[in-house]
Amino acid sequence: FMGFFIVRSEYRGQGLGDALWHARRARLLARLRPGASIGMDGVFDMQHYYAKGGFVFSHRDLRFRAQIAKRPDTPSAAVGNVVPLTDIPFDDVLAYDRTCFPAPRADFLKAWIAQPDALALGYRRDGRLGGYGVVRRCGEGCKVGPLFADDAEAAEALYGGLAGFAAGGPLFLDVPENNPAAMALARRHGMVEVFGCARMYLGPAPAIAHERVFGVTTFELG
């Protein structure tokens, strides 16, 4: 996955960004197995540039913002289903994540769910993991990512628990537009679209459970 491609304004227009982007693209292609893909979330204004490098548009990932005045109520049916993610065996978390992300990322997940000033929750249903999410404090407010869930009910319960972490400030959620249930969740909670990126792939789009992706991990990391 390619992300975080920025050139300082005083160095733009000199071909440095173009050289850097093509060098990074070539390096990633050299590391991949034949037939593997590269994904990215690119700003809309640069979509035509990435297309010239072979990347094909898949869908939009949209950043939503909400001001969280107080901890949202957890649906009564979900009480007891939302648990600290540390209560779930890590192998179960890793297996669930693998259905929503196209590569194993055990080392990353261990660090991501245990990062300071963050909260990681799981949704347990009928003795199995039915979703998980992480919220972390950032430069402005808090950001949820990822938010993976079997269905809208599980996502709603997780969102309620995670949003409470941001009470008193803004909360951001990066929603894939190709999951209507995720878009509905954002609108149901009065979230406002403030930014967006084009998800693009060089090579075939990965076979993941898009219906489970209610919030991507980050625009930089997929």
Where in this protein do the model-derived segments appear?
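Conserved N-terminal entry element of GNAT/NAT acetyltransferase domains
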Residues: 67-87
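Conserved catalytic-core motifs of GNAT/GCN5-like acyltransferases
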Residues: 35-41, 56-70, 193-205
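Short alpha-helical segment within the catalytic ATP-binding CA
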Residues: 19
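Short, structured loop/turn "capping" segments at alpha-beta junctions
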Residues: 58-60, 75, 102-108
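Conserved hydrophobic beta-strand within the GNAT/NAT acetyltransferase core sheet
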Residues: 2, 37-42, 173
